Amino acid sequence: MQFQKSIRIDADTDTVWDVVAHQFDAVGEWSSAVQSSGPNPEASTPEGATVGGRVCATDFGDLKETFTAYSEENKRFTFEVTGMPSFITKAQNTVTVKPAGANASEVSLNILMETNAIGKIMAPMFKIRLTSTLNTFLDELKDYAESGTVSAKKQKQLAKAAA
């Protein structure tokens, strides 16, 4: 399965790159798809990156995301995900940040997943859920990169976790 999603963000590429790359391990601070996140101490840090990967608490369980490619110059990185449901045998995501006009950026996600036989049967349902999650993720990234504030959904999640 392959998914491609992108969004235009009204913030310069350096600002957006800082959020998605330099604050890679802090995704749990603004994305409601991630209850909490932190650096993956087992991952080697690529040149230019602040961490080698992250560990995310999600509805799927704890996921480890580790950089497999990273380019500050091209504002592009790829990470591999482990800890997915057992029917997913490989998951990786390539994130690219490009200029999209004056003081604007385009963030592209290119996700590749390989599945076993059970995964092929479950793929249509999983694709619907993942598409919804990715749309919310990109909308929340846009809000956070443009304003520095988290979505109402994430605010509720953080308040519930603090209670």
What are these regions (language model features)?
Residues 13-14, 69-74, 96-106:
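A short, structured loop/turn motif at beta-sheet edges
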Residues 1-46, 162-163:
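Hydrophobic ligand-binding cavity/cleft-lining segments
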Residues 1, 59-63, 89, 103:
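Short acidic/polar mixed-charge low-complexity motifs
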Residues 82-136, 143, 152-154:
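Beta-strand/loop substructures that line and gate deep hydrophobic ligand-binding cavities in soluble
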Residues 13, 20, 60, 127, ...:
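A structural signal for well-ordered alpha-helical scaffolds and beta->alpha junctions
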Residues 5-7, 64-69, 91-99:
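Hydrophobic/aromatic beta-strand elements that line small-molecule binding cavities or substrate pockets
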Residues 28, 38-86, 136, 140-147, ...:
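Glycine-rich portal/gate segments that line the openings of hydrophobic small-molecule binding cavities
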